[in-house]
Amino acid sequence: MFRIHCNKCFRRRNVEPTLIFHMTQCQHVLCASCLSESSTDKKCPLCKRDLRAIPIDKNLPPNVAQYFEDPLRFQQLYRKISKFQADQRASDNLGFYRQMQEHEKNESRLKGFCKMEAQFNQQIQKEKERIAELRAYIKYHEEEGLKEWPHATGVEKPWSNQARGLRPRTPSVTTSDNTQSDEHMTTFCLDSDIDCLEEDEPRRYVKKTFNGNIKDFHI
């Protein structure tokens, strides 16, 4: 801390406590005597600028009083301020880094969901095609059943592929393409058509085939 003194005549405040000192707007210190001498031309005797001054006492404005305080106090204060602001910047950077990590995770999850959606859409399209095949297959056999139904009471008429038209492919009952052949359909039989032998004898299965004649159909 410096000793308050007049920058023109160098009189010190600690030597003359009753002497009033002033601080000018140009940051010079003048005693009352030197200030009164310069009041005629209203110029600072040191820098010749316009003279405006206030007395140095306890009523100094805060922005002027801090010029007369120990700078070490400001050094410690600014050190705390600097540390506080550095911590806040580090916290902000950490928050931004975590947000970027979360954004990358969400982006990865979104890509996975998009792949799943594409797979589901592809599977749905396959199922729609399979349903269309099933409907065509059912419609074909329903129409053939209506055509052949009058022959149940009348004279049998041999089936003709030309009259029946092109038979649709037997659709798979599962999502995998396990198409049943015509040979498999000709050996199709119901559980009630299985003849069982006596319990003490080995069981033999006799499969009855359905050749298309309505008279031969039994349950």
Curated annotation (Swiss-Prot):
Per UniProt, the RING-type Zn-finger stretches lie at: 6-48
Q: Does the keyword Metal-binding apply?
A: yes
- Swiss-Prot/TrEMBL keywords: Chromosome partition, Meiosis, Metal-binding, Zinc, Zinc-finger
> Which GO BP terms, alphabetically?
homologous chromosome pairing at meiosis; positive regulation of meiotic DNA double-strand break formation; reciprocal meiotic recombination
User: Gene3D superfamilies this protein is in?
Assistant: Zinc/RING finger domain, C3HC4 (zinc finger)
Q: Name one Pfam family in it.
A: zf-RING_5
Record-annotated disulphide pairs: none
Molecular-function annotations in GO: SUMO transferase activity; zinc ion binding
Q: Which InterPro entries match?
A: Zip3/RNF212-like, Znf_RING, Znf_RING/FYVE/PHD, Znf_RING_CS
- According to the lineage, what is the superkingdom? Eukaryota
* Other comment: Nenya, narya and vilya contain a RING-type zinc finger domain and are named after the Three Rings of Power given by the elves of Eregion in J.R.R. Tolkien's books.
- Official protein name in the record: RING finger protein nenya
At the highest ranks, the source species' classification is: Eukaryota, Metazoa, Ecdysozoa, Arthropoda, Hexapoda
- Gene designation: nenya
